[in-house]
Amino acid sequence: MKEKTYHTRCGMIHYWASVSNPDALTLVFLPGLTADHRLFDKQIQHFENRQNVIVWDAPAHASSWPFRFDFDLFDKAKWLDDILNQEGITKPVMIGQSMGGYVGQAYAQLYPDKMKGFVSIDSAPLQRSYVTAVEIWLLKRMEPVYAHYPWKWLLKSGSEGVATSDYGRNLMREMMLTYDGNQKRYAQIAGHGFRILAAAMEKDLPYEIKCPALLICGTQDHAGSCIRYNKAWHRNTKIPLTWIEGAGHNSNTDKPEQVNRLIEEFIANIL
């Protein structure tokens, strides 16, 4: 994997790529809010010698800093497309965990025919119809919660709340420690992320996935209403849904072998 950069009007994005044949399928890994490229370490290890792979530190996250919080979900999707173009990628398969899944759906809205596959890991649909007015109201008001909650407790609840395995919890803790001593930045990242998510939902766009897709969700995912959303998403769209038994919100870190196998089977069926 080679670390690379892409300049935007708001700052520089760091990403890692291993691309041997740009015209083959490329797995594009998109980490969730406040996580970084390390979230997918177990997936990268498994796939980097078999497939083209790309993973980023999302704007304002980890090494993609300093970065102005003057962008929305669609800017993220456009910058992602610019990065794929920079690498000559023609057949991206978006694999997004949580907020990363929302980036994938925004990408599908902007570039309906570019995406060759979509895997949602503990994410949820972007369509307005799935969320209540109260949920949207709350999303817009999360920053002060993260800013004023004692950091020690935030670290504990943040890492223990998203994973059930020691590996998954320790990894989330490590990723959160990137912001140790700068809780304001952590709160800004989280608050801004939730606000741009709410704004994308309020746009009330179709966010239709026109390519092959797969939903993955941990049975112990207690982040927001992920389990409820995934049941409804599957019911309404008929996109296949696989439950990861005993896994939390970062199910790819709790049961990496199972998630890797699911991704492998999924891409094998994409022409």
Enumerate the predicted regions with their spans:
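Conserved HGGG/HGGXW glycine-rich cap/lid loop of the alpha/beta-hydrolase fold
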Residues: 11-63
